[in-house]
């Protein structure tokens, strides 16, 4: 299993919209579901900083994730651009492989 971990600071007033777009049934998850190697997305909100969120995107493997990004680069970038208005900051926290 592979995990891509992202952190976001969401603009005040955009929390509900952000949660819909980035949640487990949101636009990103629906986009990823086009690939059979995508597993799930989890969205977590910081208990102490209510405008801070992390997303966990789980895939079968790092190769599957990278292949999806390469094959869908334009659509990925277009979706990412459409979400920019909701966030103050987006940071890739890491790419993690499961240790068995």
What is the meaning of each model-derived region?
Residues 2-9, 40-69:
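Short, well-ordered beta-strand segments in beta-rich or mixed alpha/beta enzyme
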Residues 7, 93-95:
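Short amphipathic
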Residues 13-19, 64-66:
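Short, conserved charged micro-motifs
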Residues 23-40, 58-93:
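An amphipathic, aromatic/His-enriched active-site/gating alpha helix that lines ligand/cofactor pockets
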